[in-house]
Amino acid sequence: MAGDQSVIWQEGPWEHRFVPSNGSRFHVVLAGPDDGPLVVLLHGFPQFWWAWRHQVPVLAAAGYRVAAMDIRGFGGSDKPPVGHSTPTLTADVGGVIRSLGSGTAVVVGHDFGGLLAWSMPVLEPDVTRAIAVLGAPHPVSLLRVRNSLTPLTRAFITRIQVPWFPERALRERDLVTRVITAASAPGRAVPPEEIAAYRAAMSLPSVAHTSLEHLRWLVRSTPRPDGRRYLAAMSRPITVPVLSVRGGRDRLAPAAAFADDAEHVHGPLRTAVVPAAGHLLPEEAPAEIADLLLEHLATLP
């Protein structure tokens, strides 16, 4: 499937649509009734919307309008060479919600999609009803504990700061397989179709580069004015309902990384641990994650 766009357009109980937002075009997978409450799903690295394939039909069957979008730089969405800051990507999500005609949405994010979910109530409060975050500490908490992240995570973040060599490894040296395997719980047999889909999506033009740019911004921006402004904004309290879930066998984000999250939430906060799962929660624990999301959604006013 290398370089084959069909991996992005996989068929299922959903429809594919391009949605304009923030001066760009985004590929969004939609399911559920048009008048249902909107739930936006944001994937992590090195994935695309397909990471949510198990949850999309479950949430839609429960009456929600589900939008699983490819984040800027991934999948079928636009891949500009620059402009991959967290505030920009957060504005992308806000624009998609507006373009879909919904007043507000519950934003669910995994991995760095979770960092965007955390950012939504602060940077896009008018369209954010609630959030759910999987495997992602609050951005300020993450900065505080970055030295206590696992050696695996620190090594990856350091290596991708070098230009071009990580891109080549993603395209040609099977780095995608290694990342997916490392992010899974120890001993997990990663389904071959999962590896094949993510390798194919990473081999699409420009994706190996643009998919890394947000991760690079997170590191490089911390001493710069744009990064300091973002972190200052994220110090404001979050008042919308929050669900935070982590995997009990997550080798990338240890439990200590989440310890300060409650300091940033001044509204309802529920935390949960999926004991047998690693970092790839939507795929390692599809039923458990669907149930947790449905429980969270059911509590919202």
Model-derived segments and spans:
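A short, glycine- and basic residue-enriched loop/turn
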Residues: 48-49, 115, 278
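Charged catalytic carboxylate motif
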Residues: 51, 92, 210, 288, ...
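Short, hydrophobic alpha-helix immediately C-terminal to the catalytic nucleophile
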Residues: 53, 118-122, 290
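Catalytic active-site module of serine/aspartate enzymes centered on a nucleophile-bearing elbow/loop
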Residues: 268-301
